Structures are given as C-alpha cells and as structure tokens.
Design a protein with these regions (language model features):
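Charged, low-complexity intrinsically disordered terminal segments
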Residues: 1-152, 158-495
C-alpha cells in the first residue's frame, strides 16, 4: 500500500539524555585513562567476530545515560534480536536509546521497530525511507534518484565516552553467530576526543532532512501504544542462542572489558564522515570522504596496503595507483575472489582492471572462500577465515597511518552512499594490519600473476609447492560468464 512520505525538510529538536547526578560507570572508567593521554585516543582493533559482538552487547549493558546507534544493515536474526533485546533492557532502566537505520535493509522489521519506538526512552528514525513498505522495489520506479543513495555509516556510542566504528553491520554473518558464512571484518573501539566527534556526527545525521521519524513512515495503532512493550522470550531461549551467550560471557575479551584491562593503543585519531546532504545528492564535491581522505592521510612514499571487500578502482583510480607505482610506491591489494564475493556483479567492475594493475607491478591478492580441508567456519580475524567473505575496509600508508571505516574503494562509496571512518596515526596499528595482510597472502588468498602470454594465473601458496590455477578458482562456468557480461554493461558508477 502506498503511504505518502513526509517532506524531507523538517528540523528536529536535539534529544535529551537521561540526567544522572553522578558520573556513569563508563565515564568513571574512561576519564582517568584519557587524562593520562591528552590529545590522543585509546584504540582497540576488533578483528575477531565474537569480540566485536561482545563489545556492542556489554557496552549496551553498561550504559547508563545514552546509546546512539547508526547502521546500514540490521538483520532479523539471532545477533540482531539479541541487540534489540539488550537495547530495550537499557531503555527500561532509563537509558535514552536513539536508533538510526538505513531503510534499504529493514524489510520484516517494521513491527519490531514499532514496538521499540513506542517505548518512551527509545527513538527510531529511518534514512531515505521507502514509501512502499511491502513491494519496496516499486519505490525505485518512482523515486530512484533518492532511494539509490544510502547511509552506509556504522557507529555504536555508549554514554558519549566509548564508540565503535568500522565495517560491520548487525547480523549473524558479521559476528560468527550462526551457521552462515562469516564476513571477515574490522571495527575499532575508541575512547578519547574522537568520541565527541562521532557523537556530533550522529547528531548531524539524526537531524538531517533525509531522515524521518518512525511515526512519519509507519502508523501506530492505539492497541500497539497500550500493549506491554516486550520482545519475544523465545529470542533468548533456543539452544544456539544460549551457547553463543555462554561463549560471550566466558570470553577473554569480555573479562578484559569488565576489568578495564583491554590492550589499548594510544594515538592521534580523526573522524572523517560524509556530509549527510550526500543522501540528497547535494553534497559539495570537496566534502566527499574519499577526496578528503587522501588529503588527511598524505601522499605515500613507500607502500600502501589496501583491504577492501569491494574494489572497483575505475579509470581515474587506476591512473592514481599507477602514478604512485611510477614514484616507487609498493601497492598491495586484498579483495574478494569471485568465489568469495557476495555481490558477483561488483566483481566485474574490478576484474576489468586486473591485468593493467598487474602489468605495472601492483600486487593483487584475492581471498579464498573456503579451506578445502576444513568444514566449519573458524574466525581467525581480519583476513584469515575459512568459509568466509571479506567485508573489511581498511588501508595503511607507509606503516604509519591507518584508515578503518565503512568506505569501500568503489564508485558507490565515493559518489552515492554516505560513509565514515577513522584516520589513526599509529605505527603499531599499521604494523599489525600489515602483519595480518602478509599472513593472509599465503594462508587465505590467491596471488594473481600474469604468465608470459599476458593471461592471469592464480597462485596458491598454501602448500610447500606453488599451485598455479589458470581460471577463476572455485567458480562455475556460468559465474565467469555472468561477470564477463556484466563488465560490458555501463553500470560501473552504480557499483
């Protein structure tokens, strides 16, 4: 059923947090640490999927004042439901919860979002909402220009003093919580000055003209308003959920978080985020995150390590990379193989540039989807998972600066979606990412090389002797044909 959307020009009054007479538990834990490191931020890279979920879950339990939560995808699965439940519990003890979701990935969540939004301490808003709630695809026929622009940002901020920013959405595939293939990903937990920047950025999006309150998009009946605000008990009661929660509670990360002994890296950290007006196509070109990113990071002189789930460099991007190679910069790129890519058509936008990049000396590595000798998913961190698909978005320059965030190296991230991330000045973190990258080159990825005839070979170096593969590994004929056909279509700007 067609529902008329509100105008996208309304200004919202800023939400007010619960007023507490004393400092919260998180504030008391964080402030002494930050006082010892003025001007720097405490950073913890979360490449383990269980730790990444534990951070969100426990910070929600610990929060006493506010929770500001912003995501592109929130799945209606075990991990998504657990976080909904713990957010509702926080609201019931007086925490003010603000939930900002991109509406492109909320099918099936309308009833749950209605229930949450009906609690006096929870506000739910949607970015670029769809007018058709059931047959959403119809919206693209009448409103493509707006609906094609999405909010890809991801942040989770507790009491204004701790934040989580990175590449993970909310869902079992990001947290190793179910039987689905695991997305290898990377988040950052941060304390210090950058948290205030994230809070202010959330406020920009919360108040922007692309965002509508849930009540403006979904009607709320009197019956729903008066019913008891409870989520189904079954969400906690099945055996798989109980086992997962037991793993959380007994994890070393959870113990370190509770004791305040997490191994933080202290470094200057800066938030970069797109202007929310990008969601309307009104952002100034100079404000686009990718253009600002390289100004902030500076020009590399030695090496760049790039890890990007979706790598579509475009003609202009290839020219920039090759210009760096000519200046003596070593460039290594890890992305998904066709077999590991969850969006096969995006692979076409990358595959067309592989030979040129290889000819000029760029190192290309493609993540394997599985390890043949393993039958279950094991989380080995950023790039070393079996049964996985790469979803991380990070790169480091000259072993001294690192970007971690939501930004993919593709036209969609550059021109259409809003993005965010941290620039972290840390040799320690850059070295860690380079080490993980180097480990993955042998264990979890194929290296691409050109043979004497200029054809691409995939080199498997997992065994003592190199194994040379002549075609896209672990793929079927129809997949390879589809990618070749997609490469012909003029859709690179959409990828």
């Amino acid at each position: 059923m067609m529902k008329k959307l509100p105008g996208f020009t309304q200004d919202y009054l800023p939400s007010k947090a619960t007023t507490l007479p004393d400092k919260t538990r998180l504030e008391r834990a964080v402030e002494p640490l930050c006082a010892r490191h003025p001007g720097e931020c405490g950073i913890l890279a979360l490449d383990n999927s269980l730790d990444a979920f534990a951070a969100r879950y426990r910070l929600t339990e610990m929060a006493a004042r506010t929770l500001d939560v912003q995501y592109y995808i929130w799945e209606d699965d075990m991990s998504g439901r657990l976080l909904f439940s713990v957010l509702l519990s926080a609201a019931k003890r007086g925490v003010h919860v603000r939930l900002l979701l991109d509406d492109n990935n909320t099918p099936g969540l309308d009833d749950t979002l209605r229930l949450l939004d009906s609690h006096p301490n929870i506000e739910v808003r949607l970015f670029n909402p769809f007018s058709f709630r059931t047959l959403r695809a119809l919206g693209y026929l009448t409103d493509f220009a707006r609906l094609n622009r999405r909010m890809h940002n991801k942040s989770y901020t507790a009491d204004g003093v701790v934040t989580l920013v990175g590449g993970r959405n909310i869902g079992d595939a990001y947290f190793g919580a179910g039987e689905e293939p695991l997305f290898s990903d990377l988040d950052v937990m941060a304390i210090g000055p950058v948290v205030n920047d994230v809070a202010n950025d959330f406020e920009r999006y919360w108040r922007c003209s692309s965002v509508s309150t849930l009540q403006q998009v979904l009607s709320l009946s009197e019956q729903e308003l008066t019913q008891r605000i409870e989520l189904p008990e079954s969400w906690y009661n099945d055996e798989i959920t109980r086992r997962y929660l037991h793993k959380l509670e007994t994890s070393r990360f959870m113990a370190d978080l509770d004791r305040g002994t997490l191994p933080l890296i202290w470094a200057k950290t800066r938030l970069l985020s797109d202007d929310p007006s990008k969601g309307e196509g009104k952002a100034q070109r100079h404000s686009l995150l990718p253009l600002r990113l390289f100004d902030v990071m500076g020009s590399p002189t030695e090496r760049i390590d790039i890890i990007s789930a979706y790598f579509v460099p475009t003609r202009a991007g290839v020219a920039q990379l090759l210009n760096l190679v000519r200046k003596g910069v070593k460039i290594a790129i890890l992305t998904n193989s066709l077999a590991a890519n969850d969006v096969a058509v995006v692979h076409a936008g990358y595959a067309r540039w592989r030979k040129k990049l290889l000819r000029y000396g760029v190192e290309l590595y493609e993540l394997k989807p599985t390890r043949e000798h393993e039958t279950v998913v094991h989380d080995r961190g950023l790039t070393g998972n079996s049964g996985s698909s790469l979803h991380a978005k990070t790169f480091s320059i000259d072993g001294s600066k690192v970007f971690i965030g939501s930004l993919n190296f593709d036209p969609r991230s550059t021109l259409l979606n809003t993005e965010m991330g941290f620039v972290i000045e840390s040799e320690t973190l850059a070295t860690l990412i380079h080490k993980r990258f180097t480990q993955s080159q042998r264990d979890a990825a194929w290296q691409l090389r050109l043979d004497r005839w200029g054809r691409i070979n995939w080199i498997d170096r997992q065994q003592e002797e190199e194994k040379v593969l002549k075609k896209e590994p672990a793929t079927r004929f129809w997949q390879r044909v589809l990618v070749r056909l997609a490469a012909i279509l003029p859709v690179e700007w959409l990828l």
